[in-house]
């Protein structure tokens, strides 16, 4: 009876939209970690709740909800630098580096109906610390300063208000871009290898 209940719950909660989990996957996740299974189910419930929100409220809700998952660096998790985890991998493990937060926010917002052409995985330089970081940019309108979703901040601000960040590259399915002074996106490459590899894994529902 308990197993039947789990199957019914997972069938109801997980749609065909990515990220989706099969009943077999849910069963495997539960065997490894009940916490991970609960996290996966909670994610689906939260996204269903967020569908009734306005776009502005969805941005805030997604940023706050996913930021609450704890960070841990790639070299600790996989012994591989710059490992781009899929949302399913991220949800199963429960933590990740900055790019993993960006990626799950990117696909979650697409799942909620955001235009993927307005969302960009963004490599930035931290002006005061001198290191590299990754955030998600959302261009609400053309030639406007993009809104920044950052795993280090619960507040969403436009890029021109983030004086601590300098945008380097904007990446999505349309290519790799730089931002001009008048806020136009200028294409510098047709594709990014890491993003292509990520998209391939997502297409295979990994």
Named regions from a protein language model:
Residues 1-2, 139:
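Generic cytosolic/nucleocytoplasmic N-terminal low-complexity/intrinsically disordered segments
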Residues 3-13:
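Sec-dependent N-terminal signal peptides
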Residues 15-206:
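A structural boundary/capping signal
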């Amino acid at each position: 009876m308990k197993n039947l209940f789990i199957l019914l719950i997972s069938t109801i909660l997980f749609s065909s939209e990515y990220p989706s989990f099969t009943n077999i996957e849910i069963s495997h996740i539960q065997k490894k970690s009940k916490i991970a299974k609960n996290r996966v189910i909670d994610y689906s419930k939260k996204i269903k709740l967020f569908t009734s929100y306005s776009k502005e409220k969805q941005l805030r809700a997604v940023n706050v909800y996913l930021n609450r998952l704890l960070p841990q660096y790639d070299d600790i998790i996989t012994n591989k630098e710059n490992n781009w985890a899929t949302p399913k991998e991220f949800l199963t493990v429960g933590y990740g580096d900055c790019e993993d937060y960006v990626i799950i926010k990117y696909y979650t917002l697409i799942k909620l109906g955001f235009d993927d052409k307005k969302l960009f995985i963004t490599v930035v330089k931290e002006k005061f610390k001198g290191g590299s970081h990754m955030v998600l940019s959302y261009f609400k309108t053309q030639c406007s300063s993009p809104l920044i979703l950052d795993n280090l901040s619960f507040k969403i601000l436009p890029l021109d208000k983030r004086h601590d960040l300098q945008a380097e590259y904007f990446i999505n399915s349309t290519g790799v871009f730089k931002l001009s002074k008048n806020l136009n996106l200028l294409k510098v490459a047709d594709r990014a290898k890491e993003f292509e590899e990520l998209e391939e894994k997502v297409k295979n529902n990994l």
